[in-house]
Amino acid sequence: MRLRSIQFENFRNHRSFSFEPEDGINLIYGQNGSGKTSILEGIHYCALTKGFVSAADGECLSFSAGYFLLTALFESSSGIETAVRLSYTKESGKKLQIDGNELKPFSLHIGSIPCISFSPPEIVIVSGPPGERRRFLDNAVCQSDRRYLDNLLIYRRLLQQRNALLQQLSQSPGKDRSMLQLWSENLASSAASVTAGRVRFLAEFHPFVELLHRDLSGGQMPSIEYRSTIGRLLEPVPESELRERFLQRFQENEQQEILRGQTLSGPHRDELIFLSDGRESKRYSSQGQQRTFLISLKLALFQYFNEKIGETPICLLDDIFSELDGKRTAAVLDILEGCGQTLISSADLKNHPGSAVHHLQTTPSTRNSEV
């Protein structure tokens, strides 16, 4: 997959801007505040309908603008073109068109344009709370497994409905509980599907992480553990068994869940643990080691997607080299040479041999790219 062109209107600090990257490695170079990250974020929006920077759609509007518009043309490795038009207004929200046709729900677009991103704030995937790791895992599996995305959306809907019933029972202790058993059974089946998809993905993904991280870290051995609310899951388990274990846990926790008005077990509370040489990275690794682990995860995703779905992802790397030493920078660049189209933002021209350089210069209303 490659991006042939993208146009920005009123997207962050790009009032009117067109960008045409080349194949291979592209360096987007400019001063801080010139809009380098915004270019990557706009591409990410077109690929996955959201930015990799944690922000609401409205925060991406240029100052005083009432809308933003992104139009992009992608080309697959087999030569098939996909035209993406994504717009947002304060009044009607976000709209997506693919090849001129409006697409709903947006989830139908996920996986069509495989995309890997890296940005410094994503260090929380390694160092932050469990929700950040679950989000990373879900985003990764959704791009490579359409069934998983469908199962995840079903699970979230069932969880919301079961929680609503638990809140009703909490507020009315004498209310009939017969419906709770039905919701528990439905949620247990859905939780089993989501959990099985996650564990299956990790079993396939881990060898890619192991190989890359050992190279980038100087020989450290990575491992990934999936700690479910029904116990540690170190290898794939039949869905039927997972369903029974979830249902049993719901029944065991029923009284406490009613008191608290929420579901206390399930994929929404599971934990993903990253370890390096057997020690939890979140607790025992330095910030530099955590960053290296994150880069290993992201580059491993590229290799996994390339093999799993048969399409080369686009790599969007925001300021990836800022805290890496020369040895690790060289190692990452060696890997990126084989990663298809890669876009790197940087305020530094050093350590980017062989890159197509796009220098961002600013005017009051426009951002221009010059090679």
Swiss-Prot record:
Q: List this protein's GO terms for biological process.
A: DNA replication; DNA synthesis involved in DNA repair; double-strand break repair; SOS response
Q: Which UniProt keywords apply?
A: ATP-binding, Cytoplasm, DNA damage, DNA repair, DNA replication, DNA-binding, Nucleotide-binding, SOS response
**Which residues participate in ATP binding?**
G30, Q31, N32, G33, S34, G35, K36, T37
One term under GO cellular component: cytoplasm
For molecular function, the Gene Ontology terms on record are: ATP binding; ATP hydrolysis activity; single-stranded DNA binding
InterPro entries for the chain = DNA-binding_RecF, DNA-binding_RecF_CS, P-loop_NTPase, Rad50/SbcC_AAA, RecF_2
* Top-rank lineage group of the source organism: Bacteria
Tell me the compartments it is located in. Answer: Cytoplasm
Q: What does this protein do?
A: The RecF protein is involved in DNA metabolism; it is required for DNA replication and normal SOS inducibility. RecF binds preferentially to single-stranded, linear DNA. It also seems to bind ATP.
* PANTHER family (UniProt xref): DNA REPLICATION AND REPAIR PROTEIN RECF
Q: Which family does it belong to?
A: Belongs to the RecF family.
Q: What is this protein called?
A: DNA replication and repair protein RecF
Q: Which organism is it from?
A: Chlorobium phaeovibrioides (strain DSM 265 / 1930) (Prosthecochloris vibrioformis (strain DSM 265))
Q: What is the lineage of its organism?
A: Bacteria, Pseudomonadati, Chlorobiota, Chlorobiia, Chlorobiales
